Amino acid sequence: MVDRSTLLTSKQMASFAAAGFLRFDGAVPDELNQAAMRELEGKVPGAPAGTPLSQTYSPESAIGRIMRLPLVEGVITSLVGPEPLFDHHAIHVRQAEEAQAQALHADAIIDTRIPSFDIQLMYYPHDVPLEMGGTLLVPGSHLRRINESDIGRYQNLRGQIPLVCQAGTLLALHHGLWHCGRQNRTGRIRYMFKVRLNPTVRQVKLWNTDDLEDPEVARILGKGYPWYEAASGRLEIVNRSKFWRYLTGDDTFDTGYWLTRLENAPSTRHLVG
C-alpha cells in the first residue's frame, strides 16, 4: 500500500493535465544513480509486455530499487494506479559529439484512446547540461493527437523546453507528449532510461485530492502555452477540460464556458399554445 503522503497533489495533477508532464529534480539518490549507470552501460533485463510492473524488475537491481522509491511509487500510483503493467523500456543513448538530433515526435503509432492514457518515466542518471542534448519537450502538446513523427518537420516551437537537469532527475510524461532527443555536443555519452506503463484501473482520483477545491487548480488548468494559436489554442483548453473531467469524475467541470456551451443541446420541447 502506497503511503498517501507520497501521492501527487491536485495542483500537481492539474499541472500534468495542462502540461502533459511532471518533473522531479534529483529524485534518485547519488548511490542509486551510480549503480544505475553501471546497469545502463550493459543491459537492463525486462519482461514481456503486459507483465505487472511489480514483477518486472528485481528488487536487488538498481532500476528495481528506483521503481520502489516512495516518491516514484507515489507518482506511478497517482497517474496509472497501484498495479500498472509494464509496456516496454529502452536505454536511450546520445553519442558523444553526435551531429544528429531526433525529429520531434510522439511515441508509437497514433493513440486514439480518449481519455485514458499511459505514462512514460524518463530517468537521467547523470547531470545533463544544455550542450549534452537532453530531451526536448513541448508542453501542452499531449492532447493534440499525432502519428509518431508526422510533426518532425517542425522545429523551434515557442515555449519548448530543452531539458537541463541534475543527476537523478525523473520525468513523468503523458504518452502523447511531443518530444525529441537533441544533439549531444559534448565529449561524453548521454544516457536516459525510459519505461512505459499501462493502467489497469480507471484513472479517476488516484492521487491525494485534499486540495481539489483549491482555486489554484482551476487557474493551472486554464493556462495557455506560447505555441498555442489564439483560436486553436482554445481547443486545447476544451480538450484539457474533458481530460480533467475524466480524472476527477466531475462531468460539470469547465475552465470557462467553452465546453459547457458545446454540450448545450436541450431535449425539453416547448409547446406553443
Predicted regions and their residues:
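Non-heme Fe(II)/2-oxoglutarate
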Residues: 182-273
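A structural signal for short, well-ordered beta-strand segments
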Residues: 89-91, 121-123, 193-197
